Structure formats: structure tokens, C-alpha cells
Design a protein with these regions (language model features):
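Short alpha-helical transmembrane segments in multi-pass integral membrane proteins
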Residues: 1-20, 79-144, 180, 184, ...
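Residue-level signal for short hydrophobic patches within transmembrane helices
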Residues: 9, 13-32, 60-67, 143, ...
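Residue-level recognition of transmembrane alpha-helices
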Residues: 20, 27, 55-58, 102, ...
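Generic alpha-helical transmembrane segments of integral inner-membrane proteins
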Residues: 24, 28, 32, 36, ...
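Helix-loop interface residues and adjacent transmembrane-helix termini in multi-pass membrane transporters
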Residues: 32-35, 45-48, 82-85, 160-161, ...
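Interfacial/gating helices of multi-pass transporter permease domains
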Residues: 41-62, 129-133
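Small-residue-rich hydrophobic transmembrane alpha-helices
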Residues: 51-111, 148-167
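Internal metal/ion-chelating core segments
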Residues: 159-192
Length: 192
């Protein structure tokens, strides 16, 4: 099944809709990560302090993910440009640079967040009753920064080739894993 599309040929409205709808659905699914945590699992099995902690942690994670996603747009543009010009050597360099940059960026960002989580939560005025759990939740999310960076980097590269379906499938699989992981840790380990 071919997932790539030329965005410069054919009916522009149809082509853009075919490309953008999976992109929008992927963003919607990603936003539902936090909703799944809150409504389906934490809200059903944990006390109010846990709900406040996850709600705050989800906001922090969403901001971080949005920044990472925005930074990867440069790679999308470069891959699309070089693919259009049929310059495979420059595409390879862009891919290598993007993957390497975001791997290093994820390490640096994780370290910064690990040392500043308490300050961030204070700036967000997290209630004292939820502070410890919010810190714990954000810290757990920080361990996934590498995967968030690399997912967004790979998705950006694929979108540069005109493939917005594969990133949608990746984020759908990640949502299923997220919900399963949440159920496993919260329900079976009675994590509050």
C-alpha cells in the first residue's frame, strides 16, 4: 500500500485533505493520551489528588510534545524540498542529522526537566496535596522524552515524503500501548 503522495499534482483540495486528515487525526489521538489517563483509568480507580496530579502532568507533557513537534517541522520541509529536487544525498544527510539531533536533544531536555520539574510544578501552582504525585507522574513522563522526540522526528521525515498515514498508525499503536500500560500499572499495581 502506497502511503506517500505528491502534493503538487492533481486536485489540490483533494490532495491536501488526503494528506492533512491523517495528520489531524494523529494530533487528536495524541491529545487523547491524557484524556485516556484521566477519564478511563485515573478517574475510575484513583482519588482526587491523583486526578489533579495527572491533569497537571499531562499539561506539562503536552507542552513539551508540542514544542518538539514544532521543532521537527524543519526536517519535514527539508525532506520535502530535497525529495522534490530529487537530491537523495541531501535527504540522507537530513535524515541522519534529524535523528541524531533529536536523540541528543532528548537527553538534554530530559536532564533539564529532571532538575526543574519541582520548579515547573510550583509555577503551575499545583495544590500541595497533589504535588508529590504530580512530580512522580511528570518524572515518569520524562523517561519517555527520547521516544517522543524520535517519534516526532520519524513522523516529520515521513510527512516530508508525503506519508501522513504511517505516523497516524504509529500514534494509534502508541495510544493502545499507553492505555494498556496505564491499566496494568494503575489497576494491577494499585498505583495511586
Amino acid at each position: 500500500m502506497k502511503h506517500t503522495a505528491s502534493l503538487t499534482q492533481g486536485n489540490i483540495l483533494q490532495v491536501l485533505l488526503r494528506f492533512s486528515i491523517p495528520f489531524l487525526l494523529a494530533n487528536l489521538l495524541h491529545a487523547l493520551y491524557g484524556a485516556a489517563d484521566l477519564m478511563m483509568i485515573i478517574g475510575a480507580y484513583c482519588p482526587a489528588e491523583s486526578i489533579a496530579a495527572v491533569s497537571t502532568g499531562t499539561q506539562v507533557t503536552q507542552i513539551i510534545t508540542s514544542v518538539i513537534s514544532g521543532l521537527t517541522l524543519g526536517a519535514t520541509i527539508l525532506v520535502a524540498k530535497y525529495a522534490g529536487r530529487q537530491q537523495p544525498d541531501k535527504i540522507e544527510k537530513t535524515i541522519g542529522t534529524t535523528i541524531t539531533f533529536f536523540a541528543l536533544f532528548s537527553i538534554i531536555l530530559s536532564l533539564i526537566l529532571a532538575f526543574s520539574t519541582g520548579m515547573i510544578l510550583q509555577l503551575l501552582q499545583v495544590p500541595q496535596a497533589s504535588m508529590a504525585q504530580a512530580y512522580q507522574y511528570v518524572f515518569i513522563c520524562i523517561t519517555g522524552i527520547f521516544f517522543i522526540c524520535e517519534y516526532n522526528a520519524f513522523s516529520a521525515l515521513l510527512r516530508g515524503y508525503g506519508d501522513s498515514i504511517s505516523p497516524l498508525l504509529f500514534v494509534a499503536a502508541a495510544c493502545v500501548c499507553n492505555i494498556a500500560g496505564d491499566l496494568f500499572t494503575v489497576v494491577f499495581f494499585i498505583w495511586e
